[in-house]
A protein has these predicted regions:
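Extracellular calcium-associated, cysteine-rich motifs in secreted modular proteins
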Residues: 409-474
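Extracellular beta-strand-rich solenoid/capping regions of secreted or surface-exposed proteins
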Residues: 71-80, 92-108, 117-134, 140-157, ...
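Extracellular beta-rich repeat passengers
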Residues: 230, 235, 240-409
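Right-handed parallel beta-helix
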Residues: 104, 109, 129-140, 155-168, ...
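Bacterial N-terminal signal peptides
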Residues: 6-16
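Acidic Gly/Asp/Thr-rich repetitive segments characteristic of extracellular carbohydrate-active
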Residues: 36-84, 449
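Bacterial Sec-dependent N-terminal signal peptides
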Residues: 3, 16-32
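Extracellular beta-strand/beta-solenoid scaffold signature
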Residues: 119-124, 144-152, 168-176, 197-211, ...
Length: 474
């Protein structure tokens, strides 16, 4: 090879290196074991990682078109670890049920500019594990004429539902049972539709809740006829028997029943009910005003699944508004008080214990102040919280329901208007606005620095940004 040929090859190689796109060398990830999903996460699902370290996808459209690359439906069906942020606020009217089939995903509703996101029209079903959903509204409605829950998650692992709002379902508002390592926290669950489109007739149910190492805390259930909540039962789940940690929740204006269930086939379910606040309302009959718990002690459909066992409940610190008797002795508020349903000590084995708990009275204040999609509360949640505080109601149903129990979303005026504003400039589309990156010493032209651990040893840079938007709500 001549010196001219060698020199030419050298110049070509140098040119190719100069023109090759810059690829950021991967940063060694920080340890994720025992790192909470975000500051303020507690309970069974508090170590879910979701889309940590994955690509950032921007929702730019409110359409439900599966071929629109900016739609939520399109993004959620895309394979791979991902964080979903929003460049728009408003109502996403689903054309059919939305299934979340790809796990390792974080849906960060707190990024929506303006009034936030509301998903309406059809149910949403979580069909994958390692899912994090924060600050999203699920207000289904009856326009499709179907029966369903606003959100369902069953038999999955490592799921965190945080600061979401649910209403106007035709079955249960939100049912999460049979899951392992699960948390639902700081959510508002309100106004399930009572005399609506369900094939079995009257419903109006809050939810079926349960699982194994499953935590439900600082949630508000308001204006449901029953299932406030209903704990796991063998008809729907014969795999997860607890422990279920039901702590610091608020229940208001139940109709036919408050909290019940808990039975299992083959063995009892283990349930802690600690420091919850129960407040009867106008729809609560006089015979149910002090009902804290109605354990299921018989089940006609359970024999085919295994020997029937009632749940074993640990009750402590629960407050029954208007009843000093039940507040001082929680078992006085149970329809069954026999030893077969009682536990004298809390269930802790296999349970990720909450790091911070409050008294029932403290939890009442915190939940009403901070629960739901509360970065910007919509008119629905504002009204619900006001009704709880003042022990009242505003609307009646159009098909026979009364005193705060409704039959259609039309009874309360339907979906609010959610205004959108211009999203902050994000030049490299890494989920962090340019202004925030510059203020924190990052490069607004480096698409890769969102995955790095420059600002925290526990959370990626983009997670630090997402968490900073809502840290005051914990």
């Amino acid at each position: 090879m001549s010196w001219r040929t060698s020199l030419c090859i050298g110049f070509v190689a140098m040119f190719m290196m100069a023109c090759e796109p810059h690829v950021q060398p991967p940063t060694p990830p920080a340890p994720t074991a025992n790192v909470p999903t975000f500051p303020g996460a507690q309970g069974g699902g508090m170590y879910a990682t979701g889309g940590r370290g994955g690509l950032v996808y921007h929702v730019t459209s409110l359409s439900d078109d599966p071929n629109d690359s900016g739609s939520l439906r399109y993004i959620l069906k895309t394979p791979g670890k991902k964080i979903v942020v929003f460049d728009v606020s408003g109502v996403i009217q689903l054309k059919r049920q939305l299934d979340i089939t790809e796990g390792a995903v974080t849906i960060a509703g707190q990024t929506a500019p303006g009034d936030g996101i509301c998903i309406a029209g059809h149910p949403v079903v979580i069909k994958a594990s390692n899912v994090i959903i924060r600050f999203v509204r699920f207000r289904m409605g009856d326009e499709a004429g179907e029966e369903g829950d606003a959100l369902t998650c069953t038999e999955k692992r490592d799921v965190m539902i945080d600061h979401c709002s649910f209403s106007w379902s035709t079955d249960e508002c939100v049912s999460c049972y049979g899951n392992t390592n699960f948390t639902m926290q700081y959510c508002i669950v309100s106004e399930s539709l009572r005399n609506s489109t369900h094939g079995k007739g009257r419903h109006g149910y809050g939810g079926i809740w349960g699982g194994k190492n499953a935590t439900f805390h600082h949630n508000l259930l308001a204006h449901h006829d029953s299932r406030n909540p209903r704990f796991d039962h063998s008809y729907v789940d014969n795999k997860c028997f607890g422990p279920i940690d039901y702590v610091n929740n608020v229940v208001y204006n139940w109709g036919g029943n408050s909290t019940y269930g808990g039975e299992g086939a083959g063995q009892p379910r283990l349930i802690n009910m600690v420091n919850n606040y129960y407040k009867p309302g106008p729809a609560t009959s006089s015979s149910k005003k002090t009902r804290l718990l109605d354990p299921t002690v018989s089940c006609s459909s359970c024999s085919k699944l295994g020997t029937f066992f009632p749940g074993k409940f640990y009750l402590n610190g629960n407050h029954m508004h208007g009843s000093e008797t039940v507040t001082n002795d929680n078992w006085k508020g149970s329809t069954v008080q026999t030893d077969e349903v009682k536990s004298l000590t809390p269930w802790t084995e296999g349970l990720t214990l909450m790091t911070q708990t409050q008294t029932a009275q403290e939890a009442y204040t915190t939940t009403l102040d901070k629960a739901g999609c509360s970065l910007v509360r919509d008119d629905v949640d504002k009204r619900i919280v006001d009704e709880v505080r003042n022990a009242t109601y505003t609307y009646t149903g159009s098909n026979g329901s009364t005193k705060g129990l409704i039959d259609s979303q039309k009874d309360v005026g339907g979906w609010p208007q959610y205004n959108s504003t211009t999203p902050p400039t994000d030049t490299d589309k890494d989920g962090m606005p340019d202004e925030w990156e510059t203020a924190n010493g990052l490069n607004p032209n480096n698409v890769w620095d969102g995955k790095e651990y420059t600002l925290s040893q526990e959370y990626t840079n983009v997670e630090v940004y997402l968490n900073s938007l809502v840290q005051h709500l914990y």
